């Protein structure tokens, strides 16, 4: 579910996640929640995963959400070379993991000349920007999915009678 191709959308406000190829029960303390398996699509992989470090899957999923939100806003992936960049496309593509590892990305469609957010171009998208900028950060500074769910842009957009409930049942 870590890439746009794994999301199925319909004519109503329904999104179905697919390709849930790897999952793991999150253990209770004192057992470590850290994972070591390299998985997922490179374009959506968090820096710690690409660098072979032990990682918390919840945090790398948060990173992948940031990549998805950015892609939906910008119609491009955040770590691809900027449109119009000169050079061999294969060499530019080969640099993508390096840009991910350095958290080197910028806005394009909503950017000013320096790649920073332009309030005029991004009017009405500030909440989405805050989510993306909170997710595409190094692991120690990245917001959790619970933090993102509590952000007004997300919280106020979800209207489910009775509210959303998290299921904590273990599936056999």
Please report, for each region that a protein language model flagged, where it lies by residue.
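Regulatory extensions appended to serine/threonine kinase catalytic cores
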Residues: 160-172
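C-terminal lobe of the eukaryotic/viral protein kinase catalytic domain
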Residues: 77-140
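Hydrophobic anchor on a C-lobe helix of Hanks-type protein kinase catalytic domains
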Residues: 72-76
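Conserved activation segment of eukaryotic-like protein kinases, specifically the C-terminal portion
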Residues: 35-49
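Conserved end of the kinase activation segment
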Residues: 49-59
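Terminal C-lobe "cap" of eukaryotic-type protein kinase domains
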Residues: 137-161
């Amino acid at each position: 579910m870590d890439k746009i191709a794994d999301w199925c959308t319909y004519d109503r406000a329904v999104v179905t996640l697919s390709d849930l190829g790897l999952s793991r029960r999150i253990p209770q303390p004192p057992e470590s929640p850290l994972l070591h398996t390299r998985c997922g699509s490179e374009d959506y992989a968090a820096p710690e995963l690409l660098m072979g470090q032990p990682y918390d899957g919840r945090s790398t999923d948060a990173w992948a959400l940031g990549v998805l939100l950015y892609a939906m806003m910008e119609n491009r992936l955040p770590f691809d070379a900027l449109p119009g960049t000169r050079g061999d496309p294969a060499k530019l593509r080969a640099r993508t993991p390096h840009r991910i590892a350095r958290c080197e990305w910028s806005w394009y469609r909503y950017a000013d000349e320096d790649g920073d957010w332009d309030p005029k171009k991004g009017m009405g998208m500030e909440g989405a920007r805050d989510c993306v900028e909170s997710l595409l950060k190094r692991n120690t500074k990245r917001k959790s999915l619970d933090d993102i769910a509590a952000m007004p842009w997300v919280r106020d957009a979800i209207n489910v009678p009775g509210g959303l409930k998290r299921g904590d049942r273990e599936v056999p």
